[in-house]
Amino acid sequence: MANHRIDRVGMEIKREVNEILRLRVNDPRVQDVTITDVQMLGDLSMAKVFYTIHSTLASDNQKAQIGLEKATGTIKRELGKNLTMYKIPDLQFVKDESIEYGNKIDEMLRNLDKKD
């Protein structure tokens, strides 16, 4: 049962953070950021927030990370307004590499088809 609650809280935080980034954070560094997943610690004290950015430039990725870290206070404050939780978890933003990894595998498979 506790695991189900952790998953629900993670999904709610994912939805809310996407909404907050879209409507409340006016930082151009995070305009193209999309939250892909949220993993919660068992005691709900920490949320690892995975994100992607629509740019492949390393400088844009770094700027997005800095922008998210700067906006953490605003995001937590807005989460506190929108969620009915005793304590809002600490947020750790991590770039989601799974989409890039999947794209790389797709490209390798396409190259295999071309060679045959």
UniProtKB/Swiss-Prot annotation:
It comes from Streptococcus agalactiae. GO terms for molecular function: ribosomal small subunit binding. This is Ribosome-binding factor A. The keyword Cytoplasm applies. The lineage of its organism: Bacteria, Bacillati, Bacillota, Bacilli, Lactobacillales. PANTHER family: RIBOSOME-BINDING FACTOR A, CHLOROPLASTIC-RELATED (PTHR33515:SF1). One of several proteins that assist in the late maturation steps of the functional core of the 30S ribosomal subunit. Associates with free 30S ribosomal subunits (but not with 30S subunits that are part of 70S ribosomes or polysomes). Required for efficient processing of 16S rRNA. May interact with the 5'-terminal helix region of 16S rRNA. The keyword Cytoplasm applies. Keywords: Cytoplasm, Ribosome biogenesis. GO terms for cellular component: cytosol. Belongs to the RbfA family. One of its GO terms (biological process) is maturation of SSU-rRNA. Monomer. Binds 30S ribosomal subunits, but not 50S ribosomal subunits or 70S ribosomes. It is found in: Cytoplasm.
